[in-house]
């Protein structure tokens, strides 16, 4: 197989719940999002939720949008846990966040394993992204905020 083997070492909540899993890799060019890209799974993924304590609030909250998106599209249990643990999530309680990240990653991995190249069921993961990408690029807002607006 051609390409470069890589690992995903995710240090933001957004990366942990979204970009770390799925194998969609892209590069923006000017105002065009993900114009160059490929599908390739990382050799392994590390999601160290302790790192999330170092993030500025704006970056952390951006990741929460992707976490909520995952709950909305596929996991009533995840949604309930987010709803019932809002205070601990805001406080970045590591045990709660670790559980939520794990649930989100497992959900996404299950979807991707059925449709790696995004020809059918995987498209559900794009919820919020259709308008979100346009908002993100033209209004210069963080990805998570744009996805939240797109939802």
Q: For the regions a protein language model found, what residue spans apply to each?
A:
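A glycine/threonine-rich phosphate-anchoring loop and its flanking beta-alpha core
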Residues: 1-85
